[in-house]
């Protein structure tokens, strides 16, 4: 019987370490880590139709609507071999997004990282980004 591949979602508040833990889990299981933020940046940089729509919201500091978030994530899921597995970082964020995802692929694991509000705030206040290379680091 073939081994079931990881098709998982990773949840947690900002500063909880989703990105760090997600990279380690994705490496361990040999699956791609898919984060909506990275997908948004790629779509914007490539100047796709979706990217232009995303930029219109991100540029003014507005939340990207669920329909658009779903379209960006589903585009990526269609581009990879989902039967080989994947790990979604921070998506879905609500019931509408979860229902949309469920129509495309079945998730077999959900992981939640819990962290206190004070610790989350401490970590976020210590987060910095290099203006040149865009690397995020902590002080």
Label each PLM-derived region with a short phrase.
Residues 1-139:
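Glycine-rich phosphate-binding loop of ATP-dependent small-molecule kinases
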């Amino acid at each position: 019987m073939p081994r079931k591949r990881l098709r998982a979602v990773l949840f947690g508040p900002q500063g909880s370490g989703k990105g760090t833990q997600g990279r380690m889990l994705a490496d361990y299981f040999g699956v791609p880590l898919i984060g909506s933020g990275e997908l948004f940046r790629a779509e914007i940089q490539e100047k796709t139709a979706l990217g232009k729509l995303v930029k219109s919201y991100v540029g003014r500091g507005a939340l990207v609507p669920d329909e658009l978030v779903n379209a960006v994530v589903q585009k990526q899921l269609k581009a990879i071999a989902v039967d080989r597995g994947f790990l979604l970082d921070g998506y879905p964020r609500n019931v509408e997004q979860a229902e949309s995802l469920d129509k495309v692929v079945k998730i077999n694991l959900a992981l939640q990282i819990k962290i206190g509000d004070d610790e989350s705030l401490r970590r976020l206040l210590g987060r910095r980004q290099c203006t040149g290379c865009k690397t995020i680091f902590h002080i």
